[in-house]
């Protein structure tokens, strides 16, 4: 597995060389950000520049080509203004799930309201519902099913926050504080993530 601390040092050095004095925020999302990475985990880097042009995207792409494990690097690249004008319901978990390396997303997160969080939950739940029905009827894909459980886990994070005002970032902690029916969904997601077999019909239900 990647030694993430060493990787980040190399990454930030390359980023500063590519964009001197232009990095407003840099952070780490996903499994590595939560300390839940496996051998198959991507490295989800978040970079917010002072502004972003097509030329900047090409520069960033060339920068990534100089780094180890290029095939594992993914994430989010944006300009500051674009992020500040993003759909607020998407910013809730985007900000909460990002471990800062440089800068802060607190200003962005402060614009998110309880109505935005409710919209994120509803939109996420609708997406999971439609995805499950579509997959059972047409795709019949275990990979899609696993992705739906991942999406459901983020919905449950938001639901718990809406109920309690507490954002539980780590799934292993969240599973113990959810009601039994919701906890079972999260437990299944964690088993699938750790290499467990997908039982298509039962897990689709």
Residue ranges and their predicted role:
Residues 1-26:
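Helical scaffold of the NTase/Pol beta-like nucleotidyltransferase catalytic core
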Residues 3, 7, 57-148:
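Conserved NTP/Mg2+-binding pocket subregion across the NTase superfamily
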Residues 9, 104, 110-205:
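Conserved nucleotidyltransferase catalytic core and NTase-mimicking acidic/glycine-rich helix/loop elements
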Residues 16-17, 34-36, 141:
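Short, flexible, glycine/charge-rich loop motifs used to bind or transfer phosphoryl groups or to couple energy/partner
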Residues 21, 38-40, 86:
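A generic fold-level signal
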Residues 22, 70-71, 181:
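Secondary-structure boundary/capping positions in well-ordered alpha/beta enzyme cores
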Residues 30-62, 74-76:
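Catalytic metal-binding acidic patch
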């Amino acid at each position: 597995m990647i030694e993430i601390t060493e990787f980040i040092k190399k990454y930030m050095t390359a980023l500063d060389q590519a964009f001197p004095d232009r990095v407003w925020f840099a952070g780490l999302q996903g499994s590595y950000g939560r300390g839940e990475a496996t051998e198959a985990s991507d490295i989800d880097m978040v970079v917010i520049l002072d502004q972003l042009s097509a030329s900047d995207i090409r520069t960033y792409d060339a920068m990534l080509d100089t780094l180890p494990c290029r095939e594992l690097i993914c994430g989010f690249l944006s300009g500051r203004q674009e992020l500040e004008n993003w759909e607020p319901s998407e910013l809730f978990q985007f900000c909460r799930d990002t471990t800062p390396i440089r800068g802060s997303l607190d200003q962005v997160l402060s614009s998110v309201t309880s109505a935005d969080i409710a919209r994120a939950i509803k939109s996420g739940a609708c997406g999971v519902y439609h995805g499950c029905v579509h997959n059972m009827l047409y795709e019949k894909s275990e990979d899609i099913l696993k992705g739906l459980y991942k999406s459901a886990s983020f919905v449950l994070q938001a639901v718990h926050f809406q109920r309690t005002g507490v954002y539980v970032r780590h799934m292993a902690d969240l599973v113990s504080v959810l009601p039994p029916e919701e906890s079972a969904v999260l437990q299944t997601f964690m088993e699938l993530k750790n290499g467990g077999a997908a039982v298509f019909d039962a897990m689709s239900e």
